[in-house]
Amino acid sequence: MENLILEIISGKQVTKEEALKFFDFELEEIFFAATKIRRKYKGNKVKVCSIINAKSGQCSEDCRFCTQSTFNKTDVKVYSLTDTEKIKEFSTKALENVGCFGIVSSGNSLNDVEIEKLCEMFKNHKKVSHLGVSIGKISDETFLKLKEAGIKKMHHNLETSENFYPNICSTHNYQERVDTIKRAKKFGFEICSGGLFGMGESLKDRIDLAFTLKALDANSIPMNFLMHIKGTALEHLPALPPVEILKTIAVFRIILKTPDIMICGGREVNLRDLQSWIFQAGANGMMTGGYLTTIGRDITSDKQMIKDLGLEIEPNHTY
């Protein structure tokens, strides 16, 4: 066991079978490996990001975890694309405290008019290099428009393994999501893609997801943990124990090694007093200030936590 950890720190690529065994290790053992790898590739810098839910609700997809799906019976706010000047103002203000900012929309995709509005705003945004978009399925034509407008980063989660995906969504398939990522890479975008954990998937499913993301060469891996929202199909699932969450983060760092690992939705609810342990588990980034339809923790508290740990916030990370 100790030899395996030392080999991994030295650069050994783990197999799926070896990765699965890490869930049986003591927490301090897996922390040791994950922290060493994080420091090797990321130092003591922490990336902090935030998002805006620019278009909310009325999604035609049946993702069982999502508050914005019309197949789930939630009281989520419903509104069309937010005025782009308001998005611009909100993102500019947010970027005074965070290094990157994501514009997220509900639904399978945006229409041509919505894309044109966003692209016009991007062209006139002084901090466009700090922006990313998460707008669903995207055509090659739209990829080109976004690139010409200055966008460099594309977010598109795989959510889980290909094997488990039919359990959470039937209105589109896994390969469609993979293809969107591959086409984004073809157009030269940085890729932000990760998953949601605690939906009933197995440990093997989590490892399969990590290896898929590794094969896709994703630059940033957002890790989200299920929040049990009333009205969603998954609201009655048991919550993941905090230690299992931390081990999952560590296994992702051990498998993936070099990408940014960002801890996002569900951090506060699921980790509670163990939130600061995400960095020992190998994460080097976090989302702050709230999520799509749920409240997060304020940036001041998160910045203090990072400072107390002797870590530094990485300023102005562009794509």
UniProtKB/Swiss-Prot annotation:
<keyword id="KW-0093">Biotin biosynthesis</keyword>
<keyword id="KW-0004">4Fe-4S</keyword>
<keyword id="KW-0808">Transferase</keyword>
<keyword id="KW-0949">S-adenosyl-L-methionine</keyword>
<keyword id="KW-0001">2Fe-2S</keyword>
<comment type="subunit">
    <text>Homodimer.</text>
</comment>
<feature type="binding site">
    <location>
        <position position="192"/>
    </location>
    <ligand>
        <name>[2Fe-2S] cluster</name>
    </ligand>
</feature>
<feature type="binding site">
    <location>
        <position position="63"/>
    </location>
    <ligand>
        <name>[4Fe-4S] cluster</name>
    </ligand>
</feature>
<dbReference type="Pfam" id="PF06968">
    <property type="entry name" value="BATS"/>
</dbReference>
<dbReference type="InterPro" id="IPR013785">
    <property type="entry name" value="Aldolase_TIM"/>
</dbReference>
<dbReference type="InterPro" id="IPR007197">
    <property type="entry name" value="rSAM"/>
</dbReference>
<comment type="function">
    <text>Catalyzes the conversion of dethiobiotin (DTB) to biotin by the insertion of a sulfur atom into dethiobiotin via a radical-based mechanism.</text>
</comment>
<feature type="binding site">
    <location>
        <position position="66"/>
    </location>
    <ligand>
        <name>[4Fe-4S] cluster</name>
    </ligand>
</feature>
<dbReference type="GO" id="GO:0005506">
    <property type="term" value="F:iron ion binding"/>
</dbReference>
<dbReference type="InterPro" id="IPR006638">
    <property type="entry name" value="Elp3/MiaA/NifB-like_rSAM"/>
</dbReference>
<dbReference type="InterPro" id="IPR010722">
    <property type="entry name" value="BATS_dom"/>
</dbReference>
<dbReference type="InterPro" id="IPR024177">
    <property type="entry name" value="Biotin_synthase"/>
</dbReference>
<dbReference type="Pfam" id="PF04055">
    <property type="entry name" value="Radical_SAM"/>
</dbReference>
<comment type="pathway">
    <text>Cofactor biosynthesis; biotin biosynthesis; biotin from 7,8-diaminononanoate: step 2/2.</text>
</comment>
<feature type="binding site">
    <location>
        <position position="59"/>
    </location>
    <ligand>
        <name>[4Fe-4S] cluster</name>
    </ligand>
</feature>
<comment type="similarity">
    <text>Belongs to the radical SAM superfamily. Biotin synthase family.</text>
</comment>
<dbReference type="GO" id="GO:0051537">
    <property type="term" value="F:2 iron, 2 sulfur cluster binding"/>
</dbReference>
<keyword id="KW-0408">Iron</keyword>
<dbReference type="GO" id="GO:0004076">
    <property type="term" value="F:biotin synthase activity"/>
</dbReference>
<keyword id="KW-0479">Metal-binding</keyword>
<dbReference type="InterPro" id="IPR002684">
    <property type="entry name" value="Biotin_synth/BioAB"/>
</dbReference>
<keyword id="KW-0411">Iron-sulfur</keyword>
<protein>
    <recommendedName>
        <fullName>Biotin synthase</fullName>
        <ecNumber>2.8.1.6</ecNumber>
    </recommendedName>
</protein>
<feature type="domain" description="Radical SAM core">
    <location>
        <begin position="41"/>
        <end position="267"/>
    </location>
</feature>
<dbReference type="GO" id="GO:0009102">
    <property type="term" value="P:biotin biosynthetic process"/>
</dbReference>
<dbReference type="GO" id="GO:0051539">
    <property type="term" value="F:4 iron, 4 sulfur cluster binding"/>
</dbReference>
